C-alpha cells in the first residue's frame, strides 16, 4: 500500500497561556473588584483564567510560587510590595518561568527601578502580560549560616534594618512610604556599630557605621537616587556605608 506524507497544520490541544498571580491580600481593599479585573484583562489579552494564590502570615509567597511552577504556568506575577516580590523571586531564580511585578506595596523599589506601573493593578497586569522579558541580577544573603535568601533591590544592616523592621503596617497603609521616614527618626541618635567588610576576598579597613547597604539598584521613592552608579543588570552590587557623623 502506498503511503502518503502527512503535514500537520494545527493542534487541537493548543492552550492559552496561564498566569499565576501570587498576591498579598493586605495590599488590596476590594478583593472582589481586582479579581474580576484580573479575569477580564486575561480574557482581553488572550490568556486563560488566572491562577490566584494568596500569601499568608505563615507563608509570605514561596509555597504559592512553588505551586504555580508545579502547575507549569507561563508567567508568575508578584502582586504586593517588595517583600512579596522577594519571596516569589527566591523560588523563580534559576528557573525558566518568567516573573511579572505588580507593585502594590509601600516602597515598590524593584518596580520603580524597572520603570513599571505603581499602585495600578490593571495597568501592572497588562504590562506583565504584554511586556518583553529582561534578565536582572539578584543578590543572595544568609544570616548565621541559615538558608540563603535572595534580595532584589537593597539589603541593609543597622539603621536601615531597624527602620524597615519597625515601620508598622498601619503606618504604611495610612502614610505610604513616608511611614519609613517617621520610623527612621527614632534611630537617628544611634551611635552606630563597628564593622569589617570583605569584598571579593579583600578585607576593607574596619570602620564605624550607622548603616551598611548592599544595593542591586539605586532609585528610591520620590525620585531619590541613593546610589547613582547602581544598575540592576551589571552583575555587581554597590556597597554604601553611612557613618554616624
Question: Where do the language-model regions lie?
Answer:
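Internal anion-binding site segments
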Residues: 192, 199-202, 208-245
Amino acid at each position: 500500500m502506498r503511503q502518503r506524507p502527512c503535514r500537520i497544520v494545527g493542534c487541537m490541544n493548543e492552550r492559552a497561556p496561564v498566569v499565576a498571580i501570587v498576591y498579598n491580600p493586605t495590599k488590596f481593599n476590594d478583593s472582589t473588584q481586582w479579581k474580576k479585573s484580573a479575569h477580564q484583562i486575561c480574557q482581553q489579552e488572550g490568556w486563560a483564567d488566572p491562577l490566584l494564590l494568596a500569601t499568608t502570615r505563615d507563608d509570605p509567597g514561596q509555597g504559592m510560587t512553588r505551586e504555580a511552577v508545579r502547575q507549569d504556568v507561563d508567567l508568575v506575577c508578584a502582586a504586593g510590595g517588595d517583600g512579596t516580590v522577594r519571596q516569589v523571586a527566591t523560588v523563580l531564580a534559576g528557573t525558566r518561568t518568567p516573573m511579572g511585578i505588580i507593585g502594590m506595596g509601600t516602597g515598590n523599589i524593584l518596580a520603580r527601578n524597572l520603570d513599571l506601573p505603581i499602585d495600578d493593578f490593571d495597568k501592572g497586569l497588562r504590562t506583565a502580560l504584554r511586556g518583553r522579558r529582561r534578565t536582572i541580577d539578584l543578590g543572595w544573603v544568609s544570616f548565621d549560616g541559615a538558608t540563603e535568601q535572595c534580595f532584589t533591590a537593597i539589603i541593609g544592616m543597622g539603621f536601615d534594618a531597624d527602620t524597615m523592621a519597625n515601620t508598622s503596617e498601619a503606618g504604611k497603609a495610612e502614610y505610604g512610604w513616608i511611614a519609613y521616614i517617621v520610623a527612621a527618626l527614632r534611630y537617628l541618635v544611634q551611635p552606630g556599630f563597628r564593622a569589617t567588610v570583605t569584598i571579593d576576598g579583600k578585607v576593607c579597613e574596619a570602620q564605624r557605621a550607622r548603616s551598611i547597604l548592599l544595593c542591586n539598584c539605586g532609585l528610591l521613592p520620590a525620585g531619590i537616587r541613593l546610589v547613582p552608579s547602581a544598575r540592576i543588570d551589571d552583575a555587581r552590587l554597590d556597597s554604601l556605608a553611612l557613618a554616624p557623623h
